Amino acid sequence: EAGFESKWKQLVSHNEYKLETNANLVSMISMWYKTLRANQLKKKYENLMGVKYDLILKTRPDIILEEPIELIQSDSLAIPFGWDWSEGINDLMAWGNQSNMETYCELFYSFVSLSNSMDKINPETMLKEYLKIKNIKTERPKVDLTLRDMNIKTTYWFCK
């Protein structure tokens, strides 16, 4: 994906002045590209094997779940409560039905238009705006999780 970096930088560099926190637009677009590709691989597998998953989970490999979570199927997209920077919505983990997760995983396609339309950009505010535009309802279950790279055992509830 290193070959994509210069192209992506051309697409989004004019919006770098809008960045909040330590966000990086190239890293953000790369994250959503990888999310899209993972979902495409899942769909390819489903077609090849003749199966359809009822529930799709998107997470990161550096998340430590401190307690088991109950993945309940719903018409809403489940995004763990907390880790909401700048009044955005947590982008660490989400789960839901095929339709909601398909939409979630396709944020990449809207990335440039979203970054052009937003006054301030970080991953969480972009995700929140995208879900609002796509009319995706969310549930916010409490999930006790830690990021391994932070090397701490504290759960953050960055919500008011």
PLM regions: where:
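ER/Golgi luminal nucleotide-sugar-dependent glycosyltransferases, focusing on the catalytic module
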Residues: 1-160
